[in-house]
From Swiss-Prot:
Gene3D superfamilies: 3.40.50.1860. This is Glutamate racemase. PROSITE patterns: ASP_GLU_RACEMASE_1 (PS00923), ASP_GLU_RACEMASE_2 (PS00924). PANTHER family: GLUTAMATE RACEMASE (PTHR21198:SF2). The lineage of its organism: Bacteria, Bacillati, Bacillota, Bacilli, Bacillales. Pathway: Cell wall biogenesis; peptidoglycan biosynthesis. It holds the Pfam family Asp_Glu_race.
Length: 266
């Protein structure tokens, strides 16, 4: 029987990481939990985010996952190291992979980070980036409206273009040549963000680098699945199954996917 890779996020954003993982590892089975009922996590305090992250983690661990991907930057900043220390399966977040990808891309060591309020206030990206390259200069910008635009399914709309333009205006006057999408919801806005920032700026989706690290970690622990056993992906949400499904089936190209509603916490 296949063991799944578990993915957790505050909503649908982590599906951007799932998509990259399934591109690289098509034989793997995915269990995904999006806590859309309590989304967004960005404005919440660290202790509350850590509590929610543990609730999601325990739900998937109880279902026998072989690895956990915290596919949410805010949750990674709040709880990655505690969860990694206490679980006996491999655990990975999205901040270190995103930082490594940005440092590969930048030519002038000036990097912008777009994130939730929680991620920006945590200083997780500047810490990770400067830990890898002390010369790097980091401009962080909280974009709290982006998550609601994505969760409402408006990420291709004129509203999205307006919100992106208004939110990113402060970055246009900087000399950054690379921008990290420091929230897994943001890659759904990547075409609009790229268009606004212009050709001279590389826009980094940490999902690709995270997928590569998932593959390497599974290989290291001898957990890669190359069998042709039937794959049964499972998707769980604490919010509306229909809204989740509408976004997920489009993003993952899974028209027949089934989404299960669950409750977490009290």
């Amino acid at each position: 029987m296949k063991q799944a890779i578990g993915f957790i996020d505050s909503g649908v954003g982590g599906l951007t990481v799932v998509r990259e993982v399934l591109k690289q590892l098509p034989h793997e089975q995915v269990y995904y939990l999006g806590d859309t009922a309590r989304c967004p996590y960005g404005p919440r305090d660290k202790e509350e985010v850590a509590k929610f992250t543990w609730e999601m983690t325990n739900f998937l661990v109880d279902r026998g996952i072989k690895m956990l991907v915290i596919a949410c930057n805010t949750a990674t900043a709040a709880a990655l190291y505690d969860i990694r220390e206490k679980l006996d399966i491999p655990v990975i977040g999205v901040i270190q992979p995103g930082s490594r990808a940005a440092l590969k891309a930048t030519k002038n060591n000036k990097i912008g980070v777009l994130g939730t309020i929680g991620t920006v206030e945590s200083m997780a990206y500047p810490t990770a980036l400067k830990g890898l390259n002390r010369r790097v200069e980091v401009d962080s910008l909280a974009c709290p409206k982006f998550v609601s635009v994505v969760e409402s399914g408006e990420y291709k709309s004129a509203i999205a273009k307006k919100v992106v333009a208004e939110s990113l205006l402060p970055l246009k006057s900087t000399k950054i040549d690379t921008v990290i999408l420091g929230c897994t919801h943001y890659p759904l806005l990547k075409p609009i963000i790229e268009n606004f920032m212009g050709d001279g700026v590389s826009v980094i989706n940490s999902g690709e680098e995270t997928a590569s690290e998932v593959s390497a970690l599974l290989d290291y622990h001898n957990l890669l699945d190359a069998t042709d056993e039937e794959i049964e992906h499972r998707f769980f949400t604490t919010g509306s199954t229909q809204i989740f499904k509408d976004i997920a089936k489009d993003w993952l190209n899974m028209p027949d996917m089934i989404v299960e509603h669950i409750k977490l916490g009290k």
